[in-house]
Amino acid sequence: MIASEVREMLSFIDGNPTAYHTTAAVRDILLKAGFAELLESRKWALEPGKDYFVCRNGSSIIAFRMGDQLENYSFNVAAAHTDSPCFRIKENAEIHMGQNYTKLNTEGYGGMICATWMDRPLSVAGRVLVQENGAIVSRLVALDRDLLLIPSVAIHMNREVNDKASFNKQIDMLPLLGGAAEEGVLKKLIAAELNVAEDQILGSDLFLCIREKATVWGCNEEFISSGRLDDQQCVFGILKGLLQGRSVESINVAAFFDNEEVGSGTKQGAASTFLYDVLHRIAQNVCPSDEDFHRAVASSFMFSADNAHAVHPNHPEHTDANNCTYMNEGVVVKVHAGQKYTSDGMSMAVAKELAARAGVPLQYFANRSDKAGGSTLGNLAMAQVSMNCVDIGLPQLAMHSCYETAGAKDTVSLIRLMKEFYSSHFEETGFGTLAVHKA
């Protein structure tokens, strides 16, 4: 039987095709849970025992819950990312090929598996900046129709397609919008969807998105497949854990950053000052002393959550033989000698202790020594605000496909681990010593 949390997560992913939609959905959940919204441009007046959140760029969000007894506080931080590899629609997007075809001009966002985007119905989603009453207002849009398709070349015209697959994003990956179409047809569709005049639209951040819904499958319903599992699965798990856990002596923080898939080097990315800015402003409200802020950070702990590679059933040779991770076998701790992951002996020990308390199994991932592997957000965030940190994720197949696969049980494992984490208090008590208190 599939846990209700898994069904809820799949609905969450289906309803949020872009980072902007994900952030808005998290915002709505927090508001319904009683969190108060803050603006970075306004003065903050925080109170012990209260819950808050703040957004940046409409695509990143940090939520936090203030403990009641903050004389010796620290931060419990968990982070994930809101974006996924896809195709961004360029300005001056329409390409008209006489009276026969109208295409959209796009460019790759992140490291997607191109072939998975072909020969399937697609649509358009993102945010649109609209002029309303003298202000520029951000509006979400997701055209709920089969609108586009990227056609592959028939094997009769490309006999090497199954042997030498190679895709030029400027040639092979441009989506077909229709036959002959009037100029500005995409803008007309979006204006109609938002019920605004075309000249009110001043800007946009629009992306291609798949139309296929998430599903549960397998002979025992043991697998889930969906777009954007990386990393909305971790966003959902952290958010649920934040809402379920509480620590009277700690400040629990959930940070969801945009632009991880393109390096995080934006104002709303993990490499920005967003996390530092929020933690420092919280600290200034607790006690306006930098000394107390630095003391708190020294005792703080962070989980950087970004999905991990499961052993591939057809290609197990891509996995380190002694560090095999499988779907439905629990949360993955990721380790890298070159520090692409933040995990070290201390942080892995803390993760192991918390997992044992939560009754959650842990697995360990390391790349083969002859493979470079990917990177994530934890080490970038740590360059701005440094604390003990461990990189984790949930095991999945086909990472960066437009339709990925994971285990049906693992989301619940992450929620339980995050609940335990957010129900704990950390304290540096001596040289090489970090106490992990049950709150």
Q: What positions do the PLM features span?
A:
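N-terminal hydrophobic/helix-forming segments and targeting peptides
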Residues: 1-439
